[in-house]
């Protein structure tokens, strides 16, 4: 089990950064995205590191959402995670955007949930958990 990790989601209209320490969420930030997703991500990560006095070598794994969603956001997130993993010898993993949304509501409950993202006027991504 991974105790210290970061989850990044740039696949939708907001950047979401979540940091867990000892398997408990200690930091969560949600920022509206317009343009310059990479700049917003890097500035947000830098702010988090400064605010929490975070030692990046303590991270066990980094997660990035892998879709469905905005291709450019997914590409920026994956590029950051892969670059970080190479320079810090850290594990990485992908996470469905729909699963990330669902997990924020489930909190280890046994309830079932539908996660839905509107893709276009008549098209939706749907997953059941």
Protein language model features and the residues they cover:
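N-terminal beta-alpha supersecondary unit
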Residues: 2-64
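Stable alpha-helical structural segments in soluble proteins, enriched in small hydrophobic residues
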Residues: 48-52, 81, 87, 105
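Surface "functional belts" at beta-alpha junctions
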Residues: 24, 33, 91-129
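Short amphipathic alpha-helical face segments that pack within enzyme cores
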Residues: 40-43, 79, 100
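Generic domain-boundary/flexible-linker signal
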Residues: 16, 28, 73, 103, ...
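DPxDG-like acidic metal-binding loop motif
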Residues: 61-97
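Short amphipathic alpha-helical segments
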Residues: 18-19, 76, 106, 128
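Short glycine-rich anion-binding loops that position phosphate/pyrophosphate groups of nucleotides
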Residues: 13, 67-68, 119-122
């Amino acid at each position: 089990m991974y105790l210290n990790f970061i989850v990044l989601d740039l696949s939708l209209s907001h950047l979401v950064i979540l940091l867990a320490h000892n398997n408990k969420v200690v930091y969560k930030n949600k920022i509206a995205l317009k343009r310059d997703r990479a700049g917003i991500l890097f500035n947000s990560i830098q702010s988090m590191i400064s605010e929490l006095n975070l030692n990046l070598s303590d991270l066990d794994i980094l997660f990035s959402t892998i879709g469905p969603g905005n291709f450019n956001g997914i590409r920026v997130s994956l590029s950051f995670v892969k670059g970080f993993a190479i320079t810090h010898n850290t594990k990485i993993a992908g996470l469905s955007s729909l699963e990330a949304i669902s997990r924020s509501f489930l909190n280890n409950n046994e309830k079932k949930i539908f996660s839905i993202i509107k893709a276009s006027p008549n098209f939706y991504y749907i997953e059941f958990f």
